[in-house]
């Protein structure tokens, strides 16, 4: 897409490509539905109105596409995911897959309405699918009790639209990278049939957002990574010697006392879903809090700090899920112009919404298809490069593995996910880039948990 393309022409082109991708075949089979079941949907698809797409032609084919053909993947079956699944099933979408790696906890029941007390301990995806398949006639929800990383590109390519209700930025970035990897280019021109639209929703307390991402055409997750706040971490000196907040006491026990005392046996890791582990952290945190006259340590707060739980409000989930489901409907039917492309919701004080067009970043590490330029002195140590990859607001990598081609061989400079390799490559962190044999213009390949793709960086030496 040309950089100088006018916004209106750009919007029209996107709409045409979406309509082409969602084009449906004529003909419809017997759905077994009772008369009047889909009247509420037909009002949007079988007649025109002031808000319909200028090129939309009312017909029965769009509804049949939803009922018989359109395949939607919902990632996440938590507070937002339950709302999404319900909205999609009642809007005519019947071919729905859902992925969630979590099991149901008693704390979920107040807002995740597809679950009941008898379901505690069972996989969220499986219970949600069972509930909807039983409650909504002819609905076929297929559950996957897995991580999103467990599936390959063939799996994701089968869906017409993917919608996310995640509480993890890492997972968002990974699925963003996966959908970008599905894109096909012919002579530098994007093949629109390879685009799998991504609808992403997120909530925190009384705030939320929803966005429409057309990989390769509009701003992706990485283009706007700076919008996501970094995870709150407390300085170790404060935690150890000057605690002031109940969170400081909990973090002290989690980070220092647990590995030192190993209360459940040598090498047993802390499990945030194990009540006995949380109870131990809670009691030790109370003891430390009493030493510093700190109040406010509760079992719920302990669980929230250990599991990094994001505050959830049912009404916020309902609003954001409604927006996301509406965008799925608009894209699937091409009946209405989709959101362009980012919506913010806030009802902390009154009600506020705002929509704006997030712009693509020219040098986005995910969707620009360009190597990322980084500048360092030849005397800089590899540790400085590692710090840059993890601390940069536009990269925010978690455990980058750095490799380079030296003397015709692919060499791992540092990899921390495998203990034996980490121990072998750790000395490289204290070496300079020149000592490692890197030269000006050297390409570094970096792998990270935030993306299924390897990110290429071009190293430029500064004088």
UniProtKB/Swiss-Prot annotation:
Residues 53-70, 157-161, 192-217, 331-338 are annotated as: Interaction with UBE2M N-terminus. GO terms for molecular function: ATP binding; identical protein binding; NEDD8 activating enzyme activity; protein heterodimerization activity. The keyword Acetylation applies. This is NEDD8-activating enzyme E1 catalytic subunit. The record marks 211 as: Determines specificity for NEDD8. Gene3D superfamilies: NAD(P)-binding Rossmann-like Domain, Ubiquitin activating enzymes (Uba3). Chain: B, domain 2, Ubiquitin-like 2 activating enzyme e1b. Chain: B, domain 3. GO terms for cellular component: cytoplasm; nucleus; protein-containing complex. Pathway: Protein modification; protein neddylation. It comes from Pongo abelii. Belongs to the ubiquitin-activating E1 family. UBA3 subfamily. The modification N-acetylalanine is found at residue 2. It comes from the Eukaryota. ATP binds at residues 100-124, 148-171. Binding of TP53BP2 to the regulatory subunit NAE1 decreases activity. One of its GO terms (biological process) is regulation of cell cycle. The gene is UBA3. Arg-211 acts as a selectivity gate, preventing misactivation of ubiquitin by this NEDD8-specific E1 complex. Residues 368-463 are annotated as: Interaction with UBE2M core domain. Its EC number is 6.2.1.64. Catalytic subunit of the dimeric UBA3-NAE1 E1 enzyme. E1 activates NEDD8 by first adenylating its C-terminal glycine residue with ATP, thereafter linking this residue to the side chain of the catalytic cysteine, yielding a NEDD8-UBA3 thioester and free AMP. E1 finally transfers NEDD8 to the catalytic cysteine of UBE2M. Down-regulates steroid receptor activity. Necessary for cell cycle progression. The active site is at 237 (glycyl thioester intermediate). Residues 227-229, 352-357 are annotated as: Interaction with NEDD8.
